[in-house]
Amino acid sequence: MRCPYCGGLDTQVRDSRPTEDNTAIRRRRICPDCGGRFTTFERVQLRELMVLKRSGRRVPFDRDKLARSVDVALRKRPVDGERVERMLSGIVRQLESMGDSDITSQTIGEMVMEGLKQLDDVAYVRFASVYRNFREAKDFENALAELSQPELAQSDDVKAEGGAEGGRDKPKAAGKPPRSAE
């Protein structure tokens, strides 16, 4: 594997172990040329997915782009990285098992929103504000109302699949208690 620091091609694996959820292999590598250390992940890819954008363009699915958009929504939020990784892996598994290699960006966005709703309310609203292109304060109010009434925002596809995390994490409460403004 090419070294991200110096471009050397002769990197060596120092440590290799499965991730906590056993969906990938984490490898620590070192470059003998520059001494740089970095981590790589090896994952199974069941099929080559293509994303159908709103503009009609088809682009290859990029898990890293999905992870970056989720990271932006979760920036400075107290959410464990392993939970985020489980959510992302669950979404990718769902996409790969849908049986179609062409997936709409809307389908991906709805799955991410459902996953974020279960991880962190603030991240959910942040992601929704970009994904749904909020223009005014009323849009935020509607998103907050969806959080207090979880059944309104779920798509039927995601509900049928058991949520973006495959239903493995905590069961969802019927409703969230109101928060005090402290």
Curated annotation (Swiss-Prot):
Co-factor binding details: Binds 1 zinc ion.
Signal peptide coordinates: none
GO biological process: negative regulation of DNA-templated transcription
Keyword hit for Zinc-finger: yes
Cofactor: Zn(2+)
GO molecular function: ATP binding; DNA binding; zinc ion binding
Domain of life (superkingdom): Bacteria
Span of zinc fingers (unnamed): 3-34
Record NCBIfam families: transcriptional regulator NrdR (TIGR00244)
Biological role stated in the UniProt entry: Negatively regulates transcription of bacterial ribonucleotide reductase nrd genes and operons by binding to NrdR-boxes.
Protein name: Transcriptional repressor NrdR
Native organism: Xanthobacter autotrophicus (strain ATCC BAA-1158 / Py2)
Gene that this sequence comes from: nrdR
